[in-house]
Amino acid sequence: MGKRPRIRKAIPCAAGILIAGLAGLAGLAGLAYARGQTPQTARPQTADEAFKDIRVLKGIPVDEFMDVMGMFSASLGYCCTDCHVREAVGNIAAFAVETPKLRSARRMIALVNTINTGAFGGAKRVTCFTCHHGSDMPEAAPDLRLQYGAPPEPDPNAVGIATSSESPEPLFNKYLQAIGGTQRLANFTSFVATGTYTGYETGSAPVPLEIYAKAPNQRTTIVKMPDEDSVRVYDGVNGWIAGPERTTPLTTLSGPNLFGARLEAMMSFPTGIRQEFNRWRSGNATIEDKEFAVAQGIKTGQLPVNFYFDKSTGLLKRVMRWNQTAVGPVPMQTDYEDYRDVAGINLRFRTIVTWTDGKSTIELTEVRPNVPIEAAKFARPTPARPRR
């Protein structure tokens, strides 16, 4: 039988504007999945409050809903308009227009939920990706190349890459020493950085960027979009995103995304990272033909987080984490490159973030350490102008 090719196309319309009239399966056979327990005071807006014609997945936060859209996009190799009408690009209300693909998606979510409830006690063991693997048509027949060919290389980003209970303390000690040592890091309390941001929402063109960071865990990123700034804030407790590329004028982060914002803020002042997790595992991985030591942190209420350290230099290469959603886990990969000395601290000048909704690159050009930053920089951002 002819096999349909697996789709690996760029998805420039994904992150900010994917909206399905499917919604959360809260009303279907009782979803069971762990939500993060990160402290939070701001109530996130739910998908059915923000969007029209949400029939399933009701009651889940907007940021989780967008992660669900990312799961669909990654699993099928789809862009927004593969399921939604083309008029939805630039017109959010049109995402609610019914299409055959939306009806199929609702049925598939119900089917997968039934399998997980009946066979796995509600755990998200079967997901869209389990069958589709990047193709819109699942393959039924076995692939003989997999049976008789050379086994594929282990996935360095797999959750199960870390199998040892060995303490990660030597890895973190070497890392902290490699970036300046604990004494210098203790005196590194803030920075203001400028540079460029490149992503799907900029049309892959670099635009100006500002970062304000304060120890131990406050961070604001401002992307200077042509029409209006895109702002991401974590104030130490709450997190928000506001920008012209977003589906809602202001998104309050929740659960795994809130924890991810906290972790991102802490990575600039990493002496407390090891204490952030309840348990640790360790392992090894190969990335681009180079060996890395892996420390996997496990925090109650969250999926594991993998930290990849260069065995020779001790520097951190990658952080891999997963957001649990109503339809299963979605990955987020952050790669760190171009370490440079700034006042005795080895800082990352290039950060590449890859997730199911897109890919972005931050290139820093200047970092000013230990400068005063007014508290207002970490306040809840002003909502963006509503899109039509």
Give the ranges of each region predicted by the language model.
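Bacterial N-terminal signal peptides
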Residues: P12-G30
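The canonical Cys-X-X-Cys-His
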Residues: G77-E87, R125-D136
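N-terminal mature ectodomain segment of secretory-pathway/periplasmic proteins
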Residues: L176-T247, Q275-G283
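Gly/Gly-Pro-rich "capping" loops immediately C-terminal to redox-active cysteine motifs
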Residues: G59, A88-T114, A140-P154
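Gly/Pro-enriched, hydrophobic low-complexity segments
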Residues: K224-E228, E288-R385
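Acidic/charged, solvent-exposed loop-and-adjacent secondary-structure segments enriched in E/D, K/R, S/T
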Residues: I241-M267
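Mature N-terminal segment immediately following signal peptide/propeptide cleavage
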Residues: P44-V85, P168-G195
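N-terminal cleavable signal peptides for secretion/export
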Residues: K58, G149-P208, P383-R388
